[in-house]
Amino acid sequence: MGENIRVSILLLSTFLVACGGGGSGDSNSDKPSKNDGKLPTDTETSQGKPLTEKLQETPEDTNTPSVGGTPAEKTETIPISTVSNKNHPTASIAGMNLISLERQACGLGGLSYDNDLEHLSVQHAQYIQHMFSNANVSSFNAHSQQPLVGLEKTTGINNPYYSGVNFKDRLIAANYPNSSYIAGENISHRTAYSSNGLSLSPDTHAIDMARGLLSAPYHMRTLVNPNMNSTGAGLVTYTPFEKDANTSKGYLFVTSIAGSMTTPKDIANKIITYPCAASTGVKTGLFNESPNPVQGTNRNLATDPIGHPVHIRLADANTIKVSNVKIIDVKRNINIPINMIDTDNDPHKGTSYQLPANEAFILPITDNLKSCEVGNRKGQNCGLYGNSDYQVSFDILINNKNLETRKFTFKTGPVNYS
């Protein structure tokens, strides 16, 4: 359909941003931020206690998931010109429904829809939409509503959708009734250009954007946190500044998620994973995330992606130690090398992104896989193979006392190329 998944003139690019909790990744200063032309990097994270206790912090990310890996059954195209520049409630619900179903499949509990969180999400999406519709914005903190130098007319309080400098401020300003609990904000910003003026529906984009959020470990942590139980989202579309409305469209998927500081009793003493045995259609590769999950390894995820990470958590444990990890491609009978992120091997130790001692990530290292199926990358590494089963097994030492073993198989969806 003339739509490509590359950061180039013909593209579909996605910018994912996650901020954990009422303590957002935004500065509280009212001074204008610099629009410096650099690519977005890590957000500054607040160490403050969001209303009651320190909340989970999550990152800013530049992952660009492919629509080719969408879990939606409906992939027919529609004219871009017919997509109105507005909020699309059915699309946002479709995206969050995907996340809720993924959680339920793994025994993590579903999400109930919250109108207050929806309002927060839609309003912030509209704030960003107003910026990108009316100016060239090269770099900014997507959680922040601070004024930007040179863009004062479309940012800060001059933006008609201004609702607070950071996520915590917006929760307080909205008198969100559950703001004393944990809360988080995740943002996926996608721009699509199609030479023939056709693209996927907002619903399909939202579902794929949700799937992309689940493929990035520092976003995944918040979205599959069993403590979270309420959500609201907005999927706002717009015509990018100075672009042709017949061939270009922007999509902003903003999600707010909240819950209790206490893990449900029926989950707290269980070893949980994502993906899990019931997971299908997961993304094959991770091409970018900030903070970088492979920091310090000299790996450029954009050219050398890794496979879909596996998250492990045991809420009731003080510590876990994961060992004897194996990931096997069932069809091809090959063993996938792995790296770990845990309390002993954490590239962001000492920062707000540090994993707690009762969580870990398995990172599949897919350098030897020729998983790309089409295009210029055909025969190269695109993470795990598409539409394939992967068996995961590991030992887990709990509180340095009890050793248990886990084994399950998950299935990937179509190959994603960025």
Where do the language-model regions lie?
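Bacterial N-terminal signal peptides that target proteins for export
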Residues: 1-8
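Generic N-terminal leader/targeting and pre-domain segments
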Residues: 5, 20-23
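C-terminal motif of bacterial Sec signal peptides marking the signal peptidase cleavage site
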Residues: 15-18
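Functional surface patches built around histidine and acidic residues
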Residues: 23-32, 36-42, 47-316, 320-329, ...
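Acidic, low-complexity Ser/Thr/Gly/Pro-rich repeat segments typical of extracellular/periplasmic
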Residues: 300-418
